[in-house]
Curated annotation (Swiss-Prot):
The gene is recR. Keywords: DNA damage, DNA recombination, DNA repair, Metal-binding, Zinc, Zinc-finger. It comes from Xanthomonas euvesicatoria pv. vesicatoria (strain 85-10). GO terms for biological process: DNA recombination; DNA repair. This is Recombination protein RecR. PROSITE patterns: RECR, TOPRIM. A zinc finger (C4-type) spans 55-70. The lineage of its organism: Bacteria, Pseudomonadati, Pseudomonadota, Gammaproteobacteria, Lysobacterales. Residues 78-173 form the Toprim domain. It holds the Pfam family Toprim_4. May play a role in DNA repair. It seems to be involved in an RecBC-independent recombinational process of DNA repair. It may act with RecF and RecO. InterPro entries: DNA_Rcmb_RecR, Rcmb_RecR, Rcmb_RecR_Znf, TOPRIM_dom, TOPRIM_RecR.
Length: 197
C-alpha cells in the first residue's frame, strides 16, 4: 500500500467514530471518485484550522475575537446558558426561542481524563459571573455522569456569585447528548427548566 494512502487513512481516523475500515473506505472513495471533492475538503479543512479560533467571551468557534452572538446588542445579557460544545449551542439556537448568551465549556469535568475546571475555562466563567450582569445561569450539560457532575459544580459556582442556577428538565433522556435530541423535546426541556437546588 502507498505511504501517502496510509497517511490519508490515518488522517481520516482522527474523526470521532471513524475506525480503520471506515477511514479506508473514505480514502478510497476520495481517490477513486471524488478527487475534486477531496481538494475542496483539504482546502476547507486547512482554512478552518488556520482561521477559526475561540470567542474570548463564550469560547464558541469564530473567525473574529468576539462571535456574532456575544457581539449582538439584541441578546439578553442577564441569561447565560452553559453548554458542553458548540454543537449543543447550535441545537439550542435552532430548537428554542432562547435569546440570551452562552458559555461553551468545550467538554465536561472528567478528572480521570485530566479535565478539570481550568481546562473548561471555569475561571473565565467565574469572572463573567462576578461582573454582575448575569442573573440566571441555565445549565445545559448532557445527562451523563460527567455532565451531571459538571452541572453540580456549575450550580455551586453560580451561587457563589449570587446567580440563580437552573437546569434543563423533562424529556432529556438520562445518558443522552443534546445534539441528538429532537427539536420538540429540546424546546420543551428548555422551556420547563427548573432551579438547581
Amino acid at each position: 500500500m502507498s505511504t501517502l494512502l496510509e497517511q490519508l487513512i490515518e488522517a481520516f481516523r482522527v474523526l470521532p467514530g471513524v475506525g480503520q475500515k471506515s477511514a479506508q473506505r473514505m480514502a478510497y472513495h476520495v481517490l477513486e471518485r471524488e478527487r475534486e471533492g477531496g481538494r475542496r475538503l483539504a482546502a476547507a479543512l486547512g482554512n478552518a484550522v488556520e482561521k477559526v479560533g475561540h470567542c474570548v467571551q463564550c469560547r464558541d468557534f469564530t473567525e473574529s475575537e468576539i462571535c456574532t452572538i456575544c457581539a449582538s446588542s439584541s441578546r439578553d445579557r442577564q441569561q447565560l446558558c452553559v453548554v458542553e460544545s458548540p454543537a449543543d449551542r447550535l441545537a439550542i439556537e435552532h430548537a428554542t426561542g432562547y435569546r440570551g448568551l452562552y458559555f461553551i465549556l468545550q467538554g465536561r469535568l472528567s478528572p480521570l481524563d485530566g479535565i478539570g475546571p481550568r481546562e473548561l475555562g471555569l475561571d473565565r466563567l467565574g469572572e463573567r459571573l462576578a461582573a454582575g450582569e448575569v442573573t440566571e445561569m441555565i445549565i445545559a450539560t448532557n445527562a451523563t455522569v460527567e455532565g451531571e457532575a459538571t452541572a453540580h459544580y456549575l450550580a455551586q459556582l453560580a451561587r457563589q456569585h449570587a446567580v440563580r442556577p437552573s437546569r434543563l428538565a423533562q424529556g432529556m433522556p438520562l445518558g443522552g447528548e443534546l445534539e441528538y435530541v429532537d427539536r420538540g423535546t429540546l424546546s420543551h426541556a428548555f422551556g420547563t427548566r427548573s432551579e438547581v437546588l
